[in-house]
Amino acid sequence: MHLMVYAPYGRAGIYLLRDYCRRLGIGTTAPEIRELAASLQALPPDHPLQPLLRNAPDFRDEAGLADALLHPQDRAYSVPQFLDFLGAAGLRFGRWVRQAAYLPQCGALASSPHQPLLMRLPMEQRYAAVELFRGTMVRHSAVVYWSDAPDHHTLCFDGDAWPGFVPIRLPDTILVHERLPPGAAAVVINKSHTYTDIYLPLAAPQKKLFEAIDGRHTIAEIAPQVAQRQPARVLFEGLWRYDQVVFDTSPQQGRSR
């Protein structure tokens, strides 16, 4: 199942203003909400709520404003709290719906001096550390399973099965050809990402392999030459980490999806 919860650090401004409204006894009548909206215009420009006022859909109308700042019940979960919640509910974590923001292999952290230290951590601690580093996540969305469900969902590029994976582009994936970093023939991004450092440069041979993805052919069919196999493995694992593709891992069973 797909499960979404609020995250605490990116919503710090909401909780500050919620406490502010509670102290003033601000209610949910139309005049009170209008006065609240007008008062928010006086917020300091560096207030933690300002990025959400600019970007979050919750603040585009008075009803959304009231729901965000005056809702009596709201629970946010850090990564460790979310994973503990899953365990207590008899659920098992599968993957983040958009995982790149949680991975030290992706974005600015990939070239950080701390990347090797992060990679030494167990996976769950890695996610928690990257959440703290980014500091502005407003929600966590994950694919989860019942704890007793068969564990057939872990994707692995370390064995011999990956050449049989069928890559499928995600609908928010786009190829960009403007303002490229040195040596790149294109950059692939996922439009649903909110962090601007999460993009994957492609060299010309990688771009050719990426453009061959059609949702029908396996990696081995896209990169049939032996010399292409290792570069293809690196590329397609990177595309998966960066939320650019998913895989049909059952091509021998009729490639069902």
What are these regions (language model features)?
Residues G10:
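Phosphate-handling architecture centered on phosphoinositide signaling
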